[in-house]
């Protein structure tokens, strides 16, 4: 699933090529991708100018004028691609937006879990998913993020994945930041010192920034707005490396299910508190 860095990279690429352009037509090839009446979606979007493209958490948001927003929740396999000319739909193309300059935007989604909406300002602000999002981890300090979870008895990895606690963090960047800060994914936040929590969020911020610089992580499906793969997967220290030696101490990485997600960690470098 594309996480904060991947969606940020996509939004920057799309903004560069699409802001200021006008949507001429909408072709919906899979109605289940549009989480509202398809005819309302089409009528709202056609003829509107793209004024801004940005990200909130894992959402890609395309502003149309002052009071309309196309939101793309990419889920597992969603992609949004910009083309300079018309595009021939592929088997997994779900929506095609035609532009007045002859270009096109393609929403591609192999597994059909992605969700697309066209919402006005009021609808966006009242959408439960959107209004319950926590702070952006790159827009507040590590100290502020630490304060949000100090004393909570939940497992630290579950808190990192909780979008109401910190927006945009997923499995990849949770594992990477926990390893780099020496914290076991099953540790309870209440058992961690403020110093440890600040270090965790400092590492999370560093990992997210590095991933954005390296164009995101491509494991299976992710590509940027131009169709290019990311490179941060080559910088993984722990994610997906169960059974391999820890680069810091040589002990074999272990795996466990934490907060319903597969986790990889080093039991030597990330010790549980006795």
Curated annotation (Swiss-Prot):
**Domain of life, source organism:** Bacteria
Record text on subunit structure and interactions: Monomer.
Where, by residue number, does DNA bind? Answer: 92, 111, 152
Q: Which SUPFAM superfamilies match?
A: Glucocorticoid receptor-like (DNA-binding domain) (SSF57716), N-terminal domain of MutM-like DNA repair proteins (SSF81624), S13-like H2TH domain (SSF46946)
How is this protein named in the record? Formamidopyrimidine-DNA glycosylase
* Zinc finger motifs (FPG-type), residue ranges: 237-271
- NCBIfam families recorded for this chain? fpg, PRK01103.1
Similarity field: Belongs to the FPG family.
- Which key words are in the record? DNA damage, DNA repair, DNA-binding, Glycosidase, Hydrolase, Lyase, Metal-binding, Multifunctional enzyme, Zinc, Zinc-finger
Explain the purpose of this protein.
Answer: Involved in base excision repair of DNA damaged by oxidation or by mutagenic agents. Acts as a DNA glycosylase that recognizes and removes damaged bases. Has a preference for oxidized purines, such as 7,8-dihydro-8-oxoguanine (8-oxoG). Has AP (apurinic/apyrimidinic) lyase activity and introduces nicks in the DNA strand. Cleaves the DNA backbone by beta-delta elimination to generate a single-strand break at the site of the removed base with both 3'- and 5'-phosphates.
Recorded catalytic reaction(s): these are: Hydrolysis of DNA containing ring-opened 7-methylguanine residues, releasing 2,6-diamino-4-hydroxy-5-(N-methyl)formamidopyrimidine; 2'-deoxyribonucleotide-(2'-deoxyribose 5'-phosphate)-2'-deoxyribonucleotide-DNA = a 3'-end 2'-deoxyribonucleotide-(2,3-dehydro-2,3-deoxyribose 5'-phosphate)-DNA + a 5'-end 5'-phospho-2'-deoxyribonucleoside-DNA + H(+)
Q: Supply one GO BP term.
A: base-excision repair
What PANTHER family does UniProt report for this protein, alphabetically? FORMAMIDOPYRIMIDINE-DNA GLYCOSYLASE
Record-linked Pfam families: Fapy_DNA_glyco, H2TH, zf-FPG_IleRS
Q: List the InterPro entries hit by this protein, alphabetically.
A: DNA_glyclase/AP_lyase_DNA-bd, DNA_glyclase_Znf_dom_DNA_BS, Formamido-pyr_DNA_Glyclase, FPG_cat, MutM-like_N-ter, Ribosomal_uS13-like_H2TH, Znf_DNA_glyclase/AP_lyase, Znf_FPG/IleRS
A single GO molecular function term of this UniProt record: damaged DNA binding
